Amino acid sequence: FMNIVRTLGGDPFKQVVSCPQSVGWGGAMGPAQFIASTWVLFEDRISSNLGISGIPDPWNPAHAFMASSIYLGDLGASSGTYSAERNAACKYYSGRSCSASSLIASYGNQVISRADTIQRTMIDPLQGL
């Protein structure tokens, strides 16, 4: 976390994360909610896909959602099936597939429901314009 923020020219003691802790750095960064250790795994691919040099910024929406698309694809969502997309959402959230855990499965179901609503109400109506 400290290296990411400092490389971006920020102050790690002032940078907002989702769950600040009184000691250390807890919580996820930016709109896509990546933890620092996961973000660094994707830095090179994010930069390459965006055509940028240097470190991508987890607080920049374009960088954050490119990272999400890469990560969700790696988690299996790129196959495009309901089950694969739902499991990828669960893995993004918890590191595990949608299983018997009602909390994790509920999260995956909510993600798929919202994605379906966005597809039907915002994307499909634009087709053929």
Which residue stretches match the model-derived regions?
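Non-catalytic cell-wall polysaccharide-engagement segments
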Residues: 1-129
